[in-house]
Each structure stands twice: as structure tokens, then as C-alpha cells.
A protein has these predicted regions:
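ALDH superfamily catalytic-core signature
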Residues: 697, 719-720, 724, 731-841
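Positively charged, amphipathic and often flexible ligand-engagement surfaces
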Residues: 1-487
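Generic beta-strand/beta-sheet core signal
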Residues: 147-149, 180-183, 230-234, 263-265, ...
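Rossmann-like NAD(P) dinucleotide-binding subdomain of oxidoreductase/dehydrogenase enzymes
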Residues: 602, 630-766
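Conserved short loop/turn motifs at secondary-structure junctions
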Residues: 148-155, 232-237, 262-268, 352-353, ...
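Terminal low-complexity tails and localization/encapsulation signals of metabolic enzymes
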Residues: 406-562, 566, 573, 577-588, ...
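Long, K/E/R/D-enriched contiguous segments that form extended
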Residues: 218, 223-225, 236, 241-250, ...
Length: 841
């Protein structure tokens, strides 16, 4: 048999027409009306916006009066949707006119109607409703891939609840196929916690597989079979980990003869490699006497989220850049997946509503004789006439079926909103399928879309754009007049996880090494002082000395000030263009020493790797920003730029890299000499990044780094030679400096207490995620940490909100930063009288 068989465009188009005609025979009057509603909505973006916002806000706002006013506002803003029938349009107009005043009547009716109208898409999990639905589909010989919707998993308690929910569902005689998400059964998975979370996830997936075996179902032929579990792919960040988990569990001897499935997303360039890995695994498994497995091929549904995350982090988008490429990759994966030698070991679920993709898969399977290894999979409640037509044509069909209990229905609305948004996107097949007819512009658009994908499928590259490797030398960025942010580290990549392990190997001291002695810098000279500050590893019970740093006395401080004032190296005489070049070089060197800066922050201040990483990115941005911005000012008419003299930068310990770098670059960019006095407890970090500036071309006389005692610090802050002081620190420190030296300009960013306000209209689940991140990020040691939560009464009295907030907070992993899975590291010191006083209130 020719393994390179490809259906021709004519064959595909002929079969699409056959499938379309069958669909037309099966579609009901109610379904045609529903299709017409969608067709109208697609033509009127304001109708879609209204519906999406109303659905979303109805799921978030618990207060009837507030929700009633909000729906009225949406109607005023977007108008009554035209896709509504006459009765519903009239009711909305009456609501807009006066009904919103009767919220106690209107809102329960709206929510009940919402549940009723979505009952075909989101199935009620309560019995006997679910029993009836599953029995109907079983009689129709339509498979049901049950997706259990519920509360958002924010902590361990909810994850445990969802996990046991899956186990209970598998005991139900009429549920024989479920989809499981890692995020639904375990709350603490993140890139640097994979190794620690892996055994627990193996245990949980094993228990689910065993439950599927222990509670078999009886098929239509009276044969008992193990239930099927499909492992869903979610965000790109967990894709490789999910595949690894899937293989590891099925490799256990007790599951040798158990068949399970996993999703592969065609919009990822990695999908081809995922399929390759699955094929190799499946062939070895079957050759060893084991059962085949299944790949559920989808196009992908997290495009917007992946795009936003990539943009925020400065990473390449992991998604293929066009819909045509995604469709082409889908066809490519179908071609390989349906070859006999592949399909027999790796069964294929073709998950698509696209008639052309379906036709292509059907023709391939017919040619290869692999239809018995393939199922067509669609969404329950979406274009039901399509799956009926498939069934009529003899194809096996499985419907992805979200189910939810009544008390969690509003949590399921987000699923509904996402599906509706996807299915009405401009280039989505379903957008053009409503009222679809041959020889129309919609039909021609879809046919052309397929033809373009067909032409492209053999010319795709299958290389992920996410190739960042922190183990390699940094690629320098040339000086530019356009500012671009430095990307954070992509810890999802295995090579960067290895990089973290190398950082730990270097910076986690054993205590047997001689601690480094950091000298005192006085201009271009250094001297080791008898008076030194010892730095102990907070994560090793303060028992391991990392280094010692020399402290300046008053006389040495005066010498340092003199050097800065006289500027013997002539930094003030440099041109802005020269400084711009040097600052870019410093930025490159900072980026190249990212690992050491992170390691130093971990060891000295107890900052976690992820928190240290974003700080380095910010420091690199600062190094590029100030001269880039200053060049724009210099280009303005009537603007003269000249140095002020010597700038004193006093920086804090909680952001020991980004904040001091920002201060010194602000001074250096203007041609000023800078004295940096970092917080003593974090000073080794400053000593390290100062080397980047010196090596880049900043004279040591122009940038001096010191730590001092209290008496010498007063000499520094009151010296007439200091022309400007930049302080980030406590309010009392700023006040003391201002009192002691009211003449020198002081730019002070001082402490504060951050308040997060959550209204009754807010998304409480997302609020909890952000509250916890704000309150406990950097161990809460920052003025921007959420110290007070201000909520409306209805939120305050919401016991579910309180429970979920507590669950999310208490589930955070706390401990040594040398365990990369920990989210919260140690406090900088145990001697915090104010904090201890607060605990005792």
C-alpha cells in the first residue's frame, strides 16, 4: 500500500458535499433556528459582546441588585441583541425599561433561563437528568467523554475534592469515559516543582486508572470493558510534563493491558514531536504485549491566553502564527496518524467540527483500512446535526460532554463563554457554518481555507519557537534608540531547569568552603577591613557563612565622597552617546551574569529563583532605559542636559538587584558620579552587579559601592558634595535624612500598606489568586504586598470565598529556596519587632 496516499482536493470536496447533504437531512427545526441565531450574532459584534459580558458577569456577581443594574447597563450600551426571537427581545426591552427595578423577580428568572438555554451544551450532573442523557446517547451508540466541571482549583483542599469527584464518577455504571486535567487533581504544579509533584501525580493518575479497571462497564454487545480516561493538555507550559506523566503511569506493570488517551494540540509546532514520542512509546508497548493507546487530536483552545502570557514574559508565542498553519499541521498529523502501522498502536480521535478536516480523515482511514482505530469527536450541544450525520454514515462518534452540578453551574459559564468566543472567531469553521450552503461566499471561504492548508501541509517546520537556553552565553543586544524589555527565564524548558540546578550547585554552600571576603572599594582601590559583616544562609539555619563584606568607617566614607566629587576618571565629561553605549554593554553583562545574581540573592536574602529572575530582567531594562529615554529629551529644542554632580543611592534589601540598579543607572546616565549604599543585609548582590558596570566601562571612581555603620552613614547623607539622594526604604529613614540634611534634594520611595479592594462585582476566583500572590510573594516583604483586603459585605459574608482564600493561602509551599518547588522563602530576619507585635494583637 502506498503510504504517501493523500486524498485529492476533489475527493475531499465531494465527500464534504455528501456530509453536508446528510447534515441537511438530519437537522431539526429547533437546530436550524439556533444556527440562524448564531449567524445573526456573527454579523453583529455588539450582540456577541453583550452576550459574552452578560454570561460572564452573571457568573461573577452574586448580588441581585448589582447584577440587575449591570445587565441594564449592558443593554443600554449594546442594545437588545437582534439574534433573539420576538418574545425574548420583547422581554429584554421590558427589562431595560422597568424590569431591572424588580431584581428579586427578574434575576432568578434570567439565571433559570440561562441554565435552561445552556442545558444542551452543559449537561446537568444531578440525577436523574444525567442518567437520562447518558442513556439516550448510549442507545444512539454515541460515546460520551464526560468532562466534570466545578470550582476553580486554587488550593489543595479543592484539588482533593475534584480528585475524589473523578473517582466517584468512575464508579457510576453509566459513565464509561472521562477527561482529566492535571490542574484539576493537583494544585501545586509549576515548572520548578515538577520533580517534587511528579510522584504524587503518578499516584493520583494510577488510582484513577485502577478505578477505571475495577469498575468496568458493559458495552452494547454485552462485553465488560475498562472505562476510558483521557488526559487533557492545558497550557503549553505543562505540555511536556503532561506527556511524561502519561507515559510514566502507563509504563507501570499493572497498566500494561489498560488503554488510555492523551490530547495533542495541533496549534503547537511541538505536536509533531509529541506524536512521534507517542508512536514510539505505543509501538514498544504493543510489541511487548501491551494494549494500544489513543491520541485525541485537537486544534487547540488557549490561543489568547498563550499570546498574552508570551507577550508579558517576552517569549515567542508557542502557537503557530496562522490559522492556515494550524489546519495544515492538523492534516499532517492525520496523515501520519492514520497509517496502518501507526493507527493500530496509537488510535486516533479526530476532534473537529470542520467538514473538510473530517472528510480528509475519513478518506485517509478508508484508504488505509484504519477506520476501526479512529473516532470522530465533537462538542456536545454544538451542531448536533453534524454528529448525527456522521453516525448515519457509519462513523464512530464521541461527544466531549461537560457536566456540572447545580451549585457549580455559574463556575461552568466560563467554559461556555470560551467555547462561544472560539466558535464565533473570524476564521473559525463554525463561524461560517451557520446557515452554510454550497456556492456561497461562506462555503467558498472555507474551501479556500482548506486548499491553503492542503498546499502548506508538506512544507511545515516542526520546531518550537521556545528555544531559550540560559546555559549558553548571552547574545549581546546592540545599543538602540528603541527600548525592548528583557525576557524573563522560561522555566518550563528542561534546559533552563537544568540551569537552575547548576545555580544551586554553585551557590548553596556546604560550610566547608572558606567564605569570600569582599573588600571595601575606595575609588579604583580596594582594602580589606577588620570590621566586616557576615552573611549567613537563612535557608541553612544561619549555620553556613556565604561571605564577609568590609564596612567603611567615617574617614573612609569621606575619602569615597572626595573621589566622587573630584571625578578623577572624567565621567562627567563623557557624551550621552558614550554613556548610552556603556549602559547597553552593562545591560548585556548583567544579563550574562543572571544565574550568579539569582544565586547570590537566593543565598544572601532568601529570595526564590523565580522572584530573583524577574528582578534581573528589570535591572537589565533599567540599564537600557535611562539613556534611551534621555536621548529623546536631548533631541528636544531648548533642553540642556548636564550632570548634577554626585548622587547617593540608598537601596533596600527586599529588591537587592532591580531597585539599586535603577538608582545608579539614573545617576550614571546623566553623567553623574554615584555612590551606592545598599542595604547591609543584601550588599553582596550590589557588589556583584557593580562588576557588570565596571567591566562595561564605568570607571570605579564613578561608581563606588559601600556599606557603613550608622555613624558613617550620617557622614555620607549630610555631606555637601552629595547633590541628590535617591532612597528606597522606610519612612522613618527618609524623615531622619530630611531632618539631618534639609538642603540636599531627596527622592524617597518609602514604605506603605497595600490594600486590595474586592467589590461584589469582582471575579472572586481571580481575586483570590492575585491576593495570595500579592500577600505572600517575596514572603510578603514589600510595601506593595497585600496587607489589607477591603471587601463589600456580601463578599465578607461569603463563606465559600473565605474557605477558598484560606485554602489557596495555606496550600502555598513554604521553606528553603534551595528547594525550587517552594513558593515562599524565609524572612530576611527573625528580629522584626513590628511583625511580632502584629502577631500578638
Amino acid at each position: 500500500m502506498d503510504k504517501q496516499y493523500q486524498p485529492t482536493l476533489t475527493e475531499v470536496q465531494d465527500w464534504v458535499l455528501k456530509l453536508y447533504n446528510t447534515c441537511e437531512q438530519t437537522i431539526t427545526k429547533a437546530e436550524r433556528l439556533e444556527q440562524h441565531k448564531y449567524a445573526v450574532m456573527v454579523q453583529r459584534p455588539q450582540d456577541k459582546k453583550f452576550l459574552v459580558k452578560m454570561l460572564d458577569e452573571s457568573s461573577q456577581i452574586r448580588d441581585r441588585k448589582i447584577l440587575a443594574k449591570r445587565i441594564k447597563t449592558l443593554l443600554d450600551q449594546y442594545g437588545v441583541p437582534e439574534f433573539l426571537n420576538k418574545r425574548d427581545a420583547f422581554l429584554f426591552k421590558m427589562y431595560q425599561a422597568f424590569g431591572h427595578h424588580f431584581d428579586f423577580i427578574a434575576i432568578p428568572i434570567i439565571k433559570k433561563r440561562l441554565r435552561m438555554d445552556t442545558s444542551q451544551v452543559i449537561i446537568n450532573e444531578e440525577r436523574p437528568q444525567l442518567t437520562k442523557h447518558l442513556a439516550t446517547r448510549f442507545k444512539e451508540k454515541i460515546g460520551q467523554n464526560v468532562n466534570l466541571l466545578g470550582e476553580v482549583v486554587l488550593g489543595n483542599e479543592e484539588a482533593d475534592h475534584r480528585y475524589h469527584h473523578y473517582l466517584e464518577a468512575l464508579e457510576s455504571p453509566d459513565i464509561n469515559y472521562i477527561s482529566v486535567k492535571i490542574s484539576g487533581i493537583y494544585a501545586q504544579t509549576h515548572a520548578l516543582n515538577y520533580e517534587e509533584s511528579f510522584p504524587e501525580l503518578v499516584s493520583r493518575m494510577s488510582a484513577l486508572y485502577q478505578k477505571a479497571i475495577d469498575f468496568p462497564y458493559t458495552d452494547e454487545d454485552g462485553i465488560k470493558r475498562s472505562k476510558f480516561i483521557n488526559l487533557d493538555m492545558e497550557e503549553y507550559k505543562d505540555a511536556h510534563f503532561t506527556l511524561r506523566l502519561f507515559k510514566a503511569v502507563l509504563n507501570l506493570p499493572q497498566f500494561k493491558n489498560y488503554s488510555a488517551g492523551i490530547v495533542v494540540q495541533a496549534y503547537l509546532p511541538d505536536a509533531y514531536d509529541f506524536q512521534t514520542e507517542l508512536l514510539e512509546f505505543a509501538k514498544a508497548r504493543v510489541d511487548g504485549g501491551g494494549a494500544p493507546i489513543k491520541m485525541r487530536l485537537v486544534k487547540g483552545c488557549n490561543l489568547e491566553m498563550e499570546t498574552v502570557i508570551s507577550s508579558l514574559k517576552g517569549w515567542p508565542n508557542p502557537i503557530r502564527p496562522s490559522k492556515t498553519e494550524v489546519d495544515a499541521n492538523y492534516l499532517c498529523l492525520l496523515e501520519r496518524g492514520l497509517m496502518p502501522e501507526n493507527a493500530r498502536v496509537l488510535h486516533l480521535g479526530v476532534a473537529s467540527h470542520n467538514l473538510f478536516s473530517i472528510a480528509y480523515a475519513y478518506l485517509l482511514a478508508q484508504k488505509y483500512g484504519t477506520t476501526g482505530y479512529m473516532t470522530f469527536e465533537m462538542l456536545e450541544g454544538m451542531a448536533n446535526h453534524l454528529w448525527r450525520a456522521q453516525s448515519m454514515l457509519g462513523n464512530r462518534v464521541i461527544l466531549y460532554t461537560p457536566v456540572v452540578k447545580n451549585e457549580h453551574f455559574l463556575n461552568a459559564v466560563s467554559y461556555l463563554v470560551r467555547r462561544m468566543d472560539e466558535n464565533t472567531a473570524p476564521d473559525n469553521f463554525l463561524t461560517h457554518s451557520f446557515n452554510l450552503k454550497p456556492d456561497t461566499k461562506e462555503w467558498d471561504f472555507l474551501a479556500k481555507q482548506f486548499e491553503e492548508a492542503y498546499a502548506m501541509k508538506d512544507h511545515l517546520t516542526h520546531v518550537s519557537p521556545r528555544v531559550q537556553n540560559r546555559n549558553l552565553p548571552y547574545t549581546p543586544v546592540a545599543p538602540s534608540d528603541t527600548m525592548q524589555n528583557e525576557p524573563d527565564t522560561d522555566f518550563d524548558l528542561s534546559q533552563n531547569q537544568e540551569w537552575v540546578r547548576r545555580i544551586f550547585a554553585k551557590w548553596k554552600k556546604s560550610g566547608t568552603e572558606e567564605p569570600e571576603i569582599i573588600p571595601l572599594q575606595i575609588g579604583a582601590e580596594t582594602v580589606v577591613c577588620k570590621n566586616r559583616y557576615k552573611y549567613l544562609d537563612r535557608c541553612q539555619n544561619d549555620e553556613v557563612c556565604i561571605c564577609e563584606m568590609s564596612q567603611a568607617d567615617s574617614a573612609q566614607v569621606e575619602k569615597i565622597i572626595e573621589i566622587a566629587e573630584t571625578d578623577p576618571a572624567g565621567w562627567r565629561k563623557t557624551t550621552l552617546e558614550e554613556r548610552h553605549r556603556i549602559m547597553y554593554e552593562a545591560a548585556n553583562r548583567l544579563a550574562d551574569m543572571r544565574g550568579d545574581l539569582i544565586g547570590c540573592m537566593c543565598a544572601v536574602t532568601g529570595k526564590t529563583v523565580i522572584e530573583g529572575d524577574v528582578e534581573v530582567s528589570e535591572a537589565v531594562d533599567y540599564a537600557r532605559f535611562y539613556t534611551t529615554a534621555m536621548k529623546k529629551f536631548a533631541a528636544l529644542d531648548d533642553i540642556e542636559i548636564k550632570p548634577k554632580g554626585t548622587i547617593l543611592v540608598i537601596s533596600p534589601w527586599n529588591f537587592p538587584c532591580a531597585i539599586p540598579v535603577g538608582g545608579i543607572v539614573a545617576g550614571l546616565a546623566g553623567g553623574n558620579t554615584v555612590i551606592l549604599k545598599p542595604a547591609t543585609v543584601a550588599a553582596p548582590v550590589a557588589w556583584m552587579f557593580a562588576k557588570a558596570f565596571w567591566d562595561a566601562g564605568v570607571p570605579k571612581e564613578a561608581l563606588q559601592v559601600i556599606i557603613t555603620n550608622r555613624e558613617a552613614l550620617k557622614v555620607l547623607t549630610t555631606a555637601p558634595a552629595i547633590k541628590h539622594i535617591i532612597l528606597t526604604g522606610g519612612t522613618d529613614t527618609a524623615q531622619n535624612i530630611a531632618r539631618a540634611n534639609p538642603v540636599t534634594p531627596l527622592s524617597a520611595e518609602t514604605g506603605g500598606k497595600n490594600v486590595i479592594i474586592l467589590t461584589a462585582s469582582g471575579d472572586r476566583d481571580h481575586a483570590i489568586m492575585n491576593i495570595v500572590a500579592s500577600a505572600f510573594g517575596n514572603a510578603g516583604q514589600k510595601c506593595s504586598a497585600c496587607s489589607l483586603l477591603l471587601v463589600e459585605r456580601s463578599v465578607y459574608e461569603d463563606k465559600n470565598f473565605q474557605s477558598k482564600l484560606k485554602d489557596a493561602a495555606t496550600s502555598l509551599k513554604v521553606g528553603s529556596v534551595w528547594n525550587p518547588g517552594n513558593i515562599v522563602g524565609p524572612m530576611i530576619t527573625n528580629k522584626n519587632d513590628k511583625l511580632l507585635q502584629a502577631f500578638n494583637l
